[in-house]
Amino acid sequence: MSSLPPAIFLMGPTASGKTDLALELARVLPCELISVDSALVYRGMDIGTAKPSADVLAQFPHRLVDILDPAESYSAAEFSSDALAAMAEITAAGRIPLLVGGTMLYFKALQEGLADMPAADASVRAELEALAASEGLQVLHDRLAQVDPESAARIHPNDPQRLVRALEVYCVSGLTMSEHRARQRSQKAGPDAPGSGVLPYTVAQLCIAPAQRHILHERIERRFRHMVEQGFVEEVEALRSRGDLHLGMPSIRAVGYRQVWEYLDGSSTREEMVERGIIATRQLAKRQFTWLRSWGEVHWLDSLSCDNLPRALKYLQSLSILS
C-alpha cells in the first residue's frame, strides 16, 4: 500500500453524468469535491455551465466554483496551484479530495505539471487579439506556423485562446512554446521541483461516459434545449448588459455562451443558435474523448449503468484508496 495520501479523479465528457456520480460518492465516502471545470469558476454563469444548484452546493460544497468574475481569466497553472492547495487542506482534515470535471488540460496540469512559461503580457495579447479581429484567426495560425511549426500542428486554426498564447510566449520571451517545453524536459527536474509532474497522491482515475456515442449526442441535445428553456438566453443577456464583457474573453468563449452571444448580436436565428450550440457541445465531447483515450490507467464506467456506485467503490477498494 502506498504511503501517499489518496485522491480520486472523476473524469468524462460533457453531459456524461459526472456530477451525479460525484454526489453519490460524496454521500458514502469521507471526501470533499473539487471542480475541474474552466467554466464553473465563473459567477453568474449557471445555466449554460450546468452548474449544480445552490441547494446541491450548500449540501455538497465544491471547491473552485464561483471563484471569479466573468471578466477575469484563469489559467491551467492557476488551477493547478489552487487545486493543490485545496487538496492539501482536504487531506490535512483527514478526508479524500474528489476532483470532478471535464477540463482535461486541468487534470493534465495536475498530473504532469506545466512548462515554466513567461507570464502573460496584456499589451502583446491585445495586439494579437486585435489582429485576429481585423484579419482573422488564420493569419495568427500562419504566423505561428512560421515560428513554431510544432505548436501550429498541435493547435487548431479556430482555437483563438491557444493561438494567442503560443504567439504571446514567442513575442515576450523570444523562444517558442515548443522550445520552452523542450528545455523543461531536458532539465529533468527533481520530484519536488515546480512543474516536475509528480503529484504527491495515490490517484484513482474514474471515467464515466455512455458506451455508445449516439447516446451521448442525444443527451447533449436534450440538455442544451433544456438550458434554453430554463433561461440560458436571458442569462447571457444579463452578461452582455454589463458592458465590460466581449467574445474575446475566455468566459464568453465557453461552449454555448459564444453561440448565444452571437445570436443576441443578430448573427443567427434562435433555432440556428440552438443547433450551433448542440454541435459545439458535441465537438467539445469529441475533444474530451480524444484526451481520455490517450490517458493513463482509467477505470471506465457506463453512464447508463445502474450500478456505477458499487462498481466505483469496488475499484477504489482494489487500489487501497479506501481504508
From Swiss-Prot:
The keyword Nucleotide-binding applies. The record marks 103, 125 as: Interaction with substrate tRNA. Substrate binds at residues 14-19. It comes from the Bacteria. ATP binds at residues 12-19. Keywords: ATP-binding, Magnesium, Nucleotide-binding, Transferase, tRNA processing. Gene3D superfamilies: 1.10.20.140, P-loop containing nucleotide triphosphate hydrolases. It catalyses: adenosine(37) in tRNA + dimethylallyl diphosphate = N(6)-dimethylallyladenosine(37) in tRNA + diphosphate. One of its GO terms (molecular function) is tRNA dimethylallyltransferase activity. It holds the Pfam family IPPT. Its EC number is 2.5.1.75. Its cofactor is Mg(2+). GO terms for biological process: tRNA modification. Residues 37-40, 161-165 are annotated as: Interaction with substrate tRNA. InterPro entries: Dimethylallyltransferase, IPT, P-loop_NTPase. Catalyzes the transfer of a dimethylallyl group onto the adenine at position 37 in tRNAs that read codons beginning with uridine, leading to the formation of N6-(dimethylallyl)adenosine (i(6)A). Belongs to the IPP transferase family. PANTHER family: TRNA DIMETHYLALLYLTRANSFERASE. Monomer. This is tRNA dimethylallyltransferase. It comes from Stutzerimonas stutzeri (strain A1501) (Pseudomonas stutzeri).
